[in-house]
Structures are given as C-alpha cells and as structure tokens.
C-alpha cells in the first residue's frame, strides 16, 4: 500500500471533508515546524465524537436569534418560517423522514428524543415483561457499562437478582463473540429468556453483529415470546440497517458519533409499528410517558387522559431541546445530500480495508491467534478482519503492557500520534481505536496516520521516545 495508491483511491471515492470543521495544529495547541499551524489534523475519532458540520453553527444561531426576536412565541410563530424554519412545537418532526432511512424503518417507527441510556431505560421498562420462568435477559459480558447498569437495575426493579442476567463471554483465544456462540446461548436458556439485547456494533472491538440472523433466530426459537432489542450507538450512521425488515422489536441510539450531532446530542429510538398501530386511550401499552407523547391536538388542553400518538412518537416524554434538534438535523441533511449510508458504506469498506492492509503489512503486526512472544513490541487487531463483520473502526491492541504509563506502549504511541495531530481514541490499558469515516476522512490521511504509527514503534524500539 503506497501513497500513490491512496491518492488513486481518493480520486475514486469522493470526500465531503469541506462540509466539516476540522481541528487544526493551532487549535489543538500542537507546535509544528513541518506544517503550517492551520493545517488540518487527521481526525480518526468519529466513533467517539463526530466532527461538526459547518452548517450546524448557523442552524443553532438561527434558533438563538428566534429566541431573541420572539421568545416564547417562536413555539408557534417562528420568525424564519418563510425561509423553511420549523416552529418549536414541531421542531423534531422534520427529522423523522431523515432518520427513518438511516435505520431502515418506517417513519411511524422512529422518534428523535432524549439520550441513549435514558431512551434505553424507557424502552426496557416497556418491553421487559417477565412471566413465569421467562425472566432472564441475554447480553454480552463486555457490554458498554451503561447498558449493564440498565439491565441490572431493570431486573432488580422487578424483584430479581443478578442471576437473571445471562452474560455471554468471548471464548478463550477469540477477540469477539461469534453468531454461533450467541445462538447456543439462546438455545441453552430458551425457556427462561424474556429479552435478548446486543449492540449492533461492539464499542470496543468494532464487531458488526449479524442483526437480522440473530433476531430471526431468537424469534423462531422462542416462538415470538422473546423480545429482541439492539443498542445501535456505534451502528447508526455507520452501517446500513433495515430494522423493520429484520423484525427488530426496539432499538436505541445516540447521535454524537457517526451522526455528528455534537457532544451529548439528542438521541433516537425505533419501535416496530406492531407495538403502536393500535394505540388508543384504552388499549395502549403502559410505558414511561409524558405530554409530548400525547395526541398533539389535545396536548395543550391539559387533560388527565393519556391519548398516545399512533407511532413511536408516543414514547416521547418532554419537548426536545431546540438547539440539539437543529444540530443533528444539519448532519442528517448532509447524509441525505450525499446519498445515504448505503452509498457511504462502499467507501467505508474500502477505507477501513486500506487501513487494515497497511497495518497487517507492518513488521510490528502479529495475528491475535498466534502464539506470539508477548514481551515483543507490536500490535494486533481485535476487530474482525472480514469487512462484512465490522463498521468504520479498527481496534488495535499494543504490547507489551507496562503498568507505568510512561513506559506503556499504547500510551507512548498515542502521545506520538497526538503530537502529530492524529486524533484517535484511547481505551486503556492497551487499545487505540482508529475510525476512518467516509464522510470526512481520506485515503491519503489514513496512509499518513499508519506511517506515523509505524514511526512511533520504530522510535520506541530504538528508545528514542
């Protein structure tokens, strides 16, 4: 893999980097004699926090100006309505047709609301209905901690203890779960499972789970008595999804990673239409409810009667933050403009494969399943090497490990990369996650990032750093 090859690929796959604000050497406080201080960084951290679309700043300022000019009246009489702005009372509704294709849902199956864990908790309360022996929740042992906390407290709210959580561990010698392993766990607990909930993409390894296959297996084996949900924090905006076609019951996601909504940005949910099409004042499924999920025509009548909207919007509890909504809208409009996730996925596969090819060609690379001398300086890749089993992320495990941060290989590599304005995500003690995103990363900068990584290991080997 050469620089010329990277440049050739950049002519084949377009970049939309100009649509984004990219941190520079100067803005990051990094001194450089090799580059102009206003040179862009190489930002490979969109799996942690996406870059800001340049249009976001104006979108937010427009709403601040509406607040200045009309105050509360902007809820129903926005000063920018003639220019296409939405009154605040309906501020989130234009996002529904933008989000639905990204997750592969019908418009009546999605809502933009809340934050990831609060949304997940709301869905769990609604969908976890233990009965007789069916009380257990199957999920992964290495789940993002917030998910574990949610599952643990959910079973405790029902009077159960931690034994009602079935946590699936990665088998010795592997770096990620296999679909067959998940199926076996379903079989082993088939009469006791009430719910199965995995991540669409595993945050640490970057593994893309076979959502359709797993969902269908659980439903068929459980005779539709087991609910299947997905945490899509690292999948939404990253890989193509078809939640409705895959018959997923519910899902939740955040938007500040691949959807570029900004830190702590507003999140979203999916609920299959079978659970909301019969909503009525007398037959709705009890949930954590609020006035923003009530029929809009009666919402401001302040009635003591819950009349849920016949869609996933009925799960909304409070009116959303206008600033958060318009921030994510800027990015969603950009996704639509460039052709959506399926089109971006083609470049994403090529870009991540290009990085993988660079890494495995290094003298410092060793296969994770090899009996390698663990005292030798080097790295392996935890992420599945099969491009269909991952998104836009490679998780790189460095060795050897030292408890002293000044000596530890990962810390030293990470520091070297940062000093060269290459922004990645550390996962202590020994992992760096690299996420080349198709929207704003190029093959050329991915090439340079890999070269700086190899330089760092050369200098560590010769004790120069």
Curated annotation (Swiss-Prot):
SUPFAM superfamilies registered for this protein in UniProt: PLP-dependent transferases
Reactions performed catalytically: L-kynurenine + H2O = anthranilate + L-alanine + H(+); 3-hydroxy-L-kynurenine + H2O = 3-hydroxyanthranilate + L-alanine + H(+)
One Pfam assignment: KYNU_C
Cofactor(s) this protein requires: pyridoxal 5'-phosphate
Cellular component annotations (GO), alphabetically ordered: cytoplasm
Residues with N6-(pyridoxal phosphate)lysine modification: 257
Cell compartment(s), UniProt: Cytoplasm
GO molecular function, one term: pyridoxal phosphate binding
An example Gene Ontology biological process: 'de novo' NAD biosynthetic process from L-tryptophan
Pathway of action: Amino-acid degradation; L-kynurenine degradation; L-alanine and anthranilate from L-kynurenine: step 1/1; Cofactor biosynthesis; NAD(+) biosynthesis; quinolinate from L-kynurenine: step 2/3
Major place of residence: cytoplasm
Annotated positions binding pyridoxal 5'-phosphate: 116-117, 144-147, 231, 234, 256, 291, 319
EC number of the protein: 3.7.1.3
InterPro entries reported in the protein's UniProt record: Kynureninase, PyrdxlP-dep_Trfase, PyrdxlP-dep_Trfase_major, PyrdxlP-dep_Trfase_small
Keywords: Cytoplasm, Hydrolase, Pyridine nucleotide biosynthesis, Pyridoxal phosphate
Class of this enzyme: hydrolase
Family designation: Belongs to the kynureninase family.
Record's subunit section: Homodimer.
Record function comment: Catalyzes the cleavage of L-kynurenine (L-Kyn) and L-3-hydroxykynurenine (L-3OHKyn) into anthranilic acid (AA) and 3-hydroxyanthranilic acid (3-OHAA), respectively.
Protein name in the entry: Kynureninase
Species annotation: Scheffersomyces stipitis (strain ATCC 58785 / CBS 6054 / NBRC 10063 / NRRL Y-11545)
Gene that encodes it: BNA5
